[in-house]
Amino acid sequence: MRYYAILLVILCFGLVSCKQESDSKVLYLAHTLPQTHPVHKGILTFQEALEKKSKGSLKIKIFPDGQLGSEREVLELLQIGSVAVTKVSAATMSNFVPEYHVLGIPYLFKSKEHQFNVLEGEVGKSILEKGSKFWLRGLCYYDAGSRSFYTSSKAIRTPDDLKGLKIRVMNNQMAINMVNAMGGSATPMAYGELYTAIQQGVVDGAENNPPSFVSSNHYEVSKYYTLDQHSSVPDVLLIGTKFWEKLSAQERLWVQEAADESAQAQKIFWNESVKASMETAKAAGVEIIIPEKALFAEKSKSVLEEFVKEHPEMTELVNKIKAE
């Protein structure tokens, strides 16, 4: 049923990556987040910068809130050329490019500065380029903060408190392994189904960053938010290669420059949103728990060990990131 609904929207808008309007090309950009989210604000910056650089010859029409489907569904639209640009989690991209898995290793990054030194340097750029063979070219990374646990009825103060709890995770093996290693029961589920799932007790909680916790209203059905900050999985701004290859060299430069500018602006939006989100959650009665992160890091060590055992070819990449 959802597939046909998405198909209907595509037919109604006549989506074919972009549309020629007089002297302008209109790029279609779809993502799953609400318009209050700092990532959406970053995308608005991308839109404004691109239109300014191109003097209106390249414009962007945005479809937020999952209007065109889940992250995976929108990626498929990019691959066939029906949508030009999207934003997805690096965890979702790991289903195509294995190197993205590494970015989700628990407690891999020592700090925010360390993370973006890696992402904006040689290592991060090389990962972005690897998606092209799947028709998904990476433009830049957006800050998605650090992910932490939140629950509806039982507080998580130590990893032992996760025992017996069903925790929603993305459909990503790294996230699944992490929750299971800490003692919880990882439950993959579409993000759009999560509010009702927590409300009805289908799952006991989930894990995400503060802005997503609040902008998706999950704070309304969760009593506890535990700032264990177990992973810092970035978002990725992508352009379909079917569209990219139709652009001139100058148009490609405009797109890349606009993306880079939006990434820097989005970091500011993100930091502002984290502060505001924590205040909103506290005001709503959510208990913010500051745990001993070392306990969670120790429990999750097996995730990295198992990952490099199964993917020895990733050992060099992991070591490069640690050495940055």
Regions found by a protein language model. Give the residues of each.
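Thiol/selenol-based redox catalytic cores and closely related redox-interacting motifs
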Residues: L128
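N-terminal secretory/targeting leader peptides
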Residues: C18-H114, V123, G131-E324
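Short, low-complexity disordered leader/linker segments with a strong preference
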Residues: M1-V26
